[in-house]
Amino acid sequence: MPLKDCDQPPELSIPPTFWYRSLVAAGLYCPEVHGPARYWLTVEGSFTRALQQKCQERFHVEILREGFSTPTPEEAKRLNLAPRQLAWVREVRLCGDGRPWVLARTVIPQTCLHGHGRRLRNLGNKPLGAYLFSSPEWQRGPLETGLCKARSNGHPRLARRSLFHRGSCALLVGEYLLPRLYQSPNRG
């Protein structure tokens, strides 16, 4: 039987999020309570690869939207962009075994879209992580932990993000965990 695209309510989207420098600063310091979520919030290396290892059948990326857009004021500040400066914004669902596990949002300043950076606009359904972690030019900065303003059950409550640098270019990658990812008994 073929796998369907992700089943999810259409209103599921990237929620407003409060960002912290660490799990402890976000109040996620109790392993007994936050253990499975902590695992996903602290995965080192490629998050995409960790999700692929969790899959029993198939991992895929669904594009929700991508194109030039204005980053949020907080994202612009994090990337040192002028207010209302356009950037390439990509929002996707990362799905495993036919179910959405993660919403991801990437903000890429226009200055990073030249030369090798042109590939970032043409990823299609390929995971961004596969590109970033296959290129030694890209270096990841520290992970930040996000507490999301969840709209209802099933919406992201936790997130992680980091800056990736290549020379003077930086892009911001946020991964918003859907509860079914860390409530599942199989972490990977």
Curated annotation (Swiss-Prot):
GO terms for molecular function: chorismate lyase activity. Its main location: cytoplasm. GO terms for biological process: pyruvate biosynthetic process; ubiquinone biosynthetic process. It is found in: Cytoplasm. It is an enzyme of class 4 (lyase). Substrate binds at R90, L128, E175. SUPFAM superfamilies: Chorismate lyase-like (SSF64288). Its EC number is 4.1.3.40. Pathway: Cofactor biosynthesis; ubiquinone biosynthesis. The keyword Cytoplasm applies. InterPro entries: Chorismate--pyruvate_lyase, Chorismate_lyase_/UTRA_dom_sf. Disulfide bonds: none annotated. The keyword Calcium does not apply. Signal peptide: none annotated. Belongs to the UbiC family. This is Probable chorismate pyruvate-lyase. It comes from Marinobacter nauticus (strain ATCC 700491 / DSM 11845 / VT8).
